[in-house]
C-alpha cells in the first residue's frame, strides 16, 4: 500500500519525467532486452535494435500506462483492468518480466533524474511499480 508520502513522491517524480515519458519507456525496454535477453521472446515480430520504431512505440505504450497509473494511484485495479486482461489472457507474459521491466525503468529514471532520485523517491517508485506489477498479474489466477 502506498502511503501519502509515497503517492507524493511518485507524482513528483513522474512529473519530472514530463514529456520524456515515451523516450524513457523505450530506453527502459532497451535496457531490459540487453540485461535480460530472455524477455525478447515476447516480441518476436519486433525489430529490437536500439532506437527502432517498434521499441519506441511500445515504450510510448508503457509510458502511457504508467502515466494513467500515476493519475489513478487510488484505483490501480480499475485503471489497469484492460491492460491486465491483455497481458494475462492474450499475451500471457510471464509475471517475472514485470519485475525485470520495473528494475530497468528504475535504473533509467535514476540515470536521467539523479538529483531527484533520493532513497525515499527510489523506495516510493519501487513500491508503485510493484503495485502496478501486482495489478497486471492479478488476473493470471
From Swiss-Prot:
Residues noted as binding O2 in the record, renumbered to the chain: 58
Expressing tissues: Red blood cells.
Superkingdom, taxonomy of origin: Eukaryota
GO biological process: hydrogen peroxide catabolic process
PROSITE patterns, alphabetized: GLOBIN
Statement: the UniProt record of this protein carries the keyword Transport: yes
Keywords assigned: Heme, Iron, Metal-binding, Oxygen transport, Transport
The Globin domain, residue ranges: 1-141
Binding site for heme b: 87
GO cellular component, one term: haptoglobin-hemoglobin complex
Keyword Metal-binding in annotation: yes
Subunit structure: Heterotetramer of two alpha chains and two beta chains.
Protein family (similarity comment): Belongs to the globin family.
Protein name in UniProt: Hemoglobin subunit alpha-1
Species of origin: Bos mutus grunniens (Wild yak)
Amino acid at each position: 500500500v502506498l502511503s501519502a508520502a509515497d503517492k507524493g513522491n511518485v507524482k513528483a517524480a513522474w512529473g519530472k519525467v514530463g514529456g520524456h515519458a515515451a523516450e524513457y519507456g523505450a530506453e527502459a525496454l532497451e535496457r531490459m532486452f540487453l540485461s535480460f535477453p530472455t524477455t525478447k521472446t515476447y516480441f518476436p515480430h519486433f525489430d529490437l535494435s536500439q532506437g527502432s520504431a517498434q521499441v519506441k512505440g511500445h515504450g510510448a505504450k508503457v509510458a502511457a500506462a504508467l502515466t494513467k497509473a500515476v493519475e489513478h494511484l487510488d484505483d490501480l485495479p480499475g485503471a489497469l483492468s484492460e491492460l491486465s486482461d491483455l497481458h494475462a489472457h492474450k499475451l500471457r507474459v510471464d509475471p517475472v518480466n514485470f519485475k525485470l521491466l520495473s528494475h530497468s525503468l528504475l535504473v533509467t529514471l535514476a540515470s536521467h533524474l539523479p538529483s531527484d532520485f533520493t532513497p525515499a523517491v527510489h523506495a516510493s517508485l519501487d513500491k508503485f511499480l510493484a503495485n502496478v506489477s501486482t495489478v497486471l498479474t492479478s488476473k493470471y489466477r
